[in-house]
Amino acid sequence: MSKKQFITRWDDEQLAEANRSLAAVTGKSNLHKKDRLFPSSPFGQTAAGLEDFRGVELTETIQYLTVQGVDLSYARFVGAASLNTSTFTNCCFDRIKLDSRYVTHEFSRCSFRGAKLNNARISERFEDCDFTGSNLSKAIANDVSFIRCRFSDVNFRGAMFMHCRFEECSFEGAVFHNGSLAGSRFTGETGLLPVWGNTILDGVKINGERLV
């Protein structure tokens, strides 16, 4: 199916129910509830066994939840909705639109291929995540850990990734320019490091050695 088909398959009633169900479990006001599970999709599961929310439009922030095995590819977040202070494992956010929004807390084995994350506010830990082809221009991250993440062909123009830790990450084809990596640390194969471009590199260390 195409992006348009994933989006248009959702009718108004299905979207309203998805957001009602999410509102019942997300946020601080629902922390007292037991079994705060991410809603089930009216479309069942994908071929990969993930809960199928591809193309959904969410008006509710996914907040203070533990989410596993959900596919939110092509999802759109409207209003103030974002991914905020939650734990995501084995989730798919391919080509998701999260520009100028929060993408925070912990992400493990998640895919952000082709995602629009420009101007996003990013934290706190990403492990075994794939950002191939995503737009991270002007994104802001401070003291964030990226473990074994793939950043192939990522647009980092104007991004401010300061005091971050990149462990065994790859950056083939990634573009940095007019941003900052000040105070960040890189460990792993030096052949997998990015082309820095006109990027602030004050205090950057590679395998323990100061770069500039």
Regions found by a protein language model. Give the residues of each.
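Tandem repeat scaffolds
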Residues: 4-10, 31-212
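N-terminal, intrinsically disordered, low-complexity segments
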Residues: 2-27
